[in-house]
Every structure is written in C-alpha cells, then in structure tokens.
C-alpha cells in the first residue's frame, strides 16, 4: 500500500484527494490537540471556558444542575470512589441505567481516576448483560433497583442513586454506596490520585463489530480528547443553545454528544429518560430547545406527524436537527424541510470505533448535497479500498472506507480481529465513495448489521438462537426495509422434515431470549439457505428475494 505521507502540493483543494498516496484529507479546519501527555478527558473538558449556567435539566422532574455544581459533584464522587470504594486506574466500572442527569457525573468521575467506563443497554436481557460482564470484568456497577436483578448473580458491588433505593434491591447484592450521599460528601483531602495518560483506556463500549459478534472497543483519553477538540475547533452551535437528548446515554452516540462534547461547549442539555415523541416535543416547547440530535426513524415520525405536532406544540425556537445512525435519503430530507421550513437538517457518519470521527454536514449549503453524509471530519484521513484486491481507489470509486486519525480507537478488547491496521487505518466495513467535492456517500454495509431504530442488531446472534430450536434445520437473518424503523430483523428458516413450525412460533421463540429491539418481526420458510462453496450464507441473495416480494 502506498505511503501515507501527505504532500500538500498534490492535494486537490476541491476534494482533499492526494494523488501521491490515494488518500483523502479533510477540508475542515486543522485539528489542534493539547501536547500534554498526562491528561484525562474529564480534566480537558473541565478546563474549557463556559458561558452558559445550566449544564443539564431532567425533563421528567425539571431538576437542574449548573456547571459549577456538576464539577463539584464529579470531584466528590471521584473522591468517594477512590478512597471509600477502592477504585483505581485501570479498574472497569459499569453503568447500567436509563437516561438520568446523574450519568454524566458518574462517567466523568470514573474517567477522572483513570478507571475504565463501560456501559450496557438496560433493555438487554440478564443473560446478555452477564455475558458482557464476564468479558469486561467490572469491579463496580452503577445501577437502579429496577435493573439490579439483572446483575444479581454476577457478584459485583453496586452503587445506587438514592439511600432509599437500598431497600428495593434483591438480597445478596453488595451495595457499597449511593450517589446522592457521594455528591454531598466533602472531599477527603487524602493522597493525590494516580496520574492518567492520554494513551490510557478511558471507555470500553460494546460494538457489534464487522462480523456481528459483540466486542468491546478500547478508546483512550486521547481518542476522546480529539473528539471534543473537534467540537471546540468548529463549534456547531453557540453556547446559549439548548439541546434535547432523546438518544440513550449508554450508547456511543449519546455519550460522545451529551456527556462530553456539548458539555465542553457550555451548552444546556435537557435529558429525557426515554424516547417518546410527545414528551420530546413538550420538552422542545417548555425549554425553548434549539437543537435536536436524532436517529432517522424519529425524523420520519416527525414528518408523518408534522400537522399534529405543529398544532399542539410551539417549535418556533427549534433551529437545527442533527441526525446520525444511518444515511438520510433525499426524500426524507426534503420532506422534513417542507414540513419544518425554519429548521435545518444536518447529518453525519461515525462508528463506535471512530469515536465520532467520520464525516458530517456543517452548513445549509452542504445539506443540499442530498444523499451525502458530509465532508470528512477535521483531523480525519480516508481511503477507499477494494475489499477483494486491497487496491486503494480514487474519486467516485466505490470500495470499503478506511479511516485514520487521533479519534480512532485503540482496538478491540480481548479480540484478535484486525480491523485496525498496523498503520492505524480503521476498516469500517462500509462500502462508500467520495465525490469530486469531497462529500462521502454510503453505498452499502459490508458488515451486514441490521439497524433497527438506531440500534445495531447482529444477524449472527439471532441465527445462533434459531439453530437451537428443535424444528429448525438452518436459518439466516436479514435486514428487512421498514419506513418507520429503517430496518427490522427478518428470518429465513429451513424447517426439518415433517415439521409444522409456523411464523408465530419462531417469533415467540426468539422474543423470549432477546431485548425488544432484537426481536424477529417477519419469518419466511425456505427449503434451504443459499450459501457459497465455502459455506457462507448468501445474505444479499436473500435480501434481494425478500425485497422483490414487497
């Protein structure tokens, strides 16, 4: 592969393409990163200048926390974790909780100590969460009385939010503290904490990965600092703006945006406990929200229910909707702008492994490039590589997107899969091309993940469960297109001879074993699953067949 050293004289300013190494460079402002090696993400964010007063608002209770109170709470919780609980640099701490304004405090406290933050989806079943615990081996978990039973058999110590929560958890769970008391306790003034380095792991977030198996992604403090530095370099909103957080904070999309980036900009974030269209629009009106960050299915719902929304809610302060998780079609973008003419729609592209780096739309003019996910993020390099030959390609040629930059994760935890090369290139698993003006277009997904309402569903996991059914000979799971959800899991099932297995029984069999977003919602029966000579499922053939029947 060509040497990645850039030659500015050979870089086309129109699209950022360098002919000497077939690499695309960002057209955005250069990324300025701190030179200090001993620096954690919490310290970096807290050192920023804030013009706003309120950091977070709980939409359910209207409870507010100011920036000054937030940092005081972060300091006190970190002190308790260090001296009372014994959390040290490198220890893993799990957060298993629905959205609350306590989550940013917990996350920032944990990472300030050099401990490693990991999160789990509250909707996951106990067995799914316990598998993740077995892999990441957390020393402590922050959770709620409602979710504590899911980790009761793990034996790990837990911290709850309130004192009274202790009475509501199963016997046998080791409760070592509550967040309310930790935030009130004066710092101990004891020994200085361990020094944290930028290369230390800060977060261990679980991504489905390119093969569909759940993997922990190791991201360093330096990776997260680079993500936040991009927002500081090109702040996409002014500090007086108000955001509504509807996305889950356990996910990279929520964590990177609302625990880190918007906090560094000094903006106010209103946190909803869960997504509900009515509650979201009521919060937009009540708090005069200016910015929404959404996944595409919510955008579609806002289009379909625009007339009811405009009659019931005052959305006059709303100026921007940012969308991620999947590309927006021209029809959806134009449909939204027609219904909400004073609101701009910007979209972006990133992965758990890239920590927010990828591409984004940053202006009204750029948003008119329909179908594109934007220009490369500042500090990002990209290559388009033929997935079969490994040849590096050029403008308007489709291949696998490779990304490089300071935000790219260190790699997978306890997994030898090489998706980050020795030169630091992240193989995204997405088929893309970059046009003459440097805009990135997503064509298809090599990784075969199903994206249901912004959630990633690995087909391999569902296929393994299906094959445990006594009447199923073989099975394949594919993404089936859906206007509201984007995609949902559909199963092709080869029944054993003499079996009278029906669609409902297959759906019920899976629904008892997985989180709601992973449920199979359509089943078709087939004599045999088409496969390559090497035994790999020809999933694309099944997708084409399913779509042809619509």
Swiss-Prot record:
It holds the Pfam family AMP-binding. The keyword Cytoplasm does not apply. It is found in: Peroxisome. SUPFAM superfamilies: Acetyl-CoA synthetase-like. A motif (Microbody targeting signal) lies at residues 548-550. Residues 276-347 are annotated as: SBD1. GO terms for biological process: ubiquinone biosynthetic process. Its EC number is 6.2.1.12. Induction: By wounding or by jasmonic acid (JA) treatment. Residues 348-412 are annotated as: SBD2. Its cofactor is Mg(2+). ATP binds at residues 207-211, 215, 347-348, 352, 430, 445, 536. Keywords: ATP-binding, Ligase, Magnesium, Nucleotide-binding, Peroxisome. It is an enzyme of class 6 (ligase). It catalyses: (E)-4-coumarate + ATP + CoA = (E)-4-coumaroyl-CoA + AMP + diphosphate; (E)-4-coumarate + ATP + H(+) = (E)-4-coumaroyl-AMP + diphosphate; (E)-4-coumaroyl-AMP + CoA = (E)-4-coumaroyl-CoA + AMP + H(+). The keyword NADP does not apply. Its main location: other. GO terms for molecular function: 4-coumarate-CoA ligase activity; ATP binding; CoA-ligase activity. Carboxylate--CoA ligase that may use 4-coumarate as substrate. Follows a two-step reaction mechanism, wherein the carboxylate substrate first undergoes adenylation by ATP, followed by a thioesterification in the presence of CoA to yield the final CoA thioester. Both substrate-binding domains (SBD1 and SBD2) are involved in the substrate recognition, and are sufficient to confer the substrate specificity. This is 4-coumarate--CoA ligase-like 8.
């Amino acid at each position: 592969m060509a040497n990645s050293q850039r030659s500015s004289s050979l870089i086309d300013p129109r699209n950022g393409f360098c002919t000497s190494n077939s690499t695309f460079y960002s057209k955005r402002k250069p990324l300025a990163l701190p030179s200090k090696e001993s620096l954690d993400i919490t310290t970096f964010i807290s050192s920023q200048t804030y013009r706003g007063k309120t950091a977070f608002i709980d939409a359910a209770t209207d409870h507010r926390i100011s920036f000054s109170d937030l940092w005081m709470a972060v300091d006190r919780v970190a002190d308790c974790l260090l001296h009372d609980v014994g959390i040290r640099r490198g220890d893993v701490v799990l957060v298993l909780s629905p959205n609350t304004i306590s989550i940013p405090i917990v996350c920032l406290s944990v990472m300030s100590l050099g401990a490693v933050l990991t999160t789990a989806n509250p909707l996951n079943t106990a067995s799914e969460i316990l598998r993740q615990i077995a892999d990441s081996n957390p020393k402590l978990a922050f959770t709620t009385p409602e979710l504590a039973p899911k980790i009761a058999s793990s034996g790990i110590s837990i911290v709850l939010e309130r004192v009274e929560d202790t009475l509501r958890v199963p016997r046998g769970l080791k409760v070592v503290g509550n967040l309310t008391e930790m935030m009130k306790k004066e710092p101990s003034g004891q020994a200085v904490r361990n020094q944290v380095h930028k290369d230390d792991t800060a977060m261990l977030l679980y991504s489905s990965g390119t093969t569909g198996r759940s993997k922990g992604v190791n991201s360093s403090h330096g990776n997260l600092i680079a993500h936040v530095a991009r927002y500081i370099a090109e702040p996409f909103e002014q500090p007086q703006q108000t955001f509504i957080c509807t996305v889950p904070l356990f996910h990279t999309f929520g964590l990177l945006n609302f625990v880190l980036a918007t906090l560094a900009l000094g903006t106010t974030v209103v946190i909803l406990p869960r997504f509900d269209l009515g509650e979201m629009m009521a919060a937009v009106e009540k708090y005069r929200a200016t910015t929404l960050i959404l996944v595409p299915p919510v955008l579609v719902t806002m289009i379909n229910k625009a007339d009811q929304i405009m009659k019931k809610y005052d959305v006059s302060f709303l100026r921007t909707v940012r969308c991620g998780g999947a590309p927006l079609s021209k029809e959806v973008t134009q449909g939204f702008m027609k219904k909400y003419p004073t609101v701009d729609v910007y979209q972006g592209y990133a992965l758990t492994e890239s920590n927010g780096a990828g591409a984004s739309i940053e202006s009204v003019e750029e948003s008119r490039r329909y179908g594109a996910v934007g220009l490369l993020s500042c500090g990002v390099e990209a290559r388009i590589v033929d997935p079969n030959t490994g040849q590096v390609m050029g403008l308007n040629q489709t291949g696998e997107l490779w990304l490089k930059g300071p935000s790219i994760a260190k790699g997978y935890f306890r997994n030898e899969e090489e998706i980050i090369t020795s030169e630091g290139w992240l193989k995204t698993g997405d088929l893309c091309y970059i046009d003459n003006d440097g805009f990135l277009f997503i064509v298809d997904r090599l990784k075969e993940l199903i994206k249901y309402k912004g959630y990633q569903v690995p087909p391999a996991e569902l296929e393994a469960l299906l094959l445990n059914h006594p009447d199923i000979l073989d099975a394949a799971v594919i993404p089936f297109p859906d206007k509201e959800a984007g995609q949902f899991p559909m199963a092709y099932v080869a029944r054993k001879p003499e079996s009278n297995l029906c669609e409902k029984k297959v759906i019920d069999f899976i629904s008892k074993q997985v989180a709601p977003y992973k449920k199979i919602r359509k089943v078709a029966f087939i004599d045999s699953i088409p496969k390559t000579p090497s035994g790999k499922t020809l999933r694309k053939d099944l997708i084409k067949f399913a779509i042809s029947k619509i």
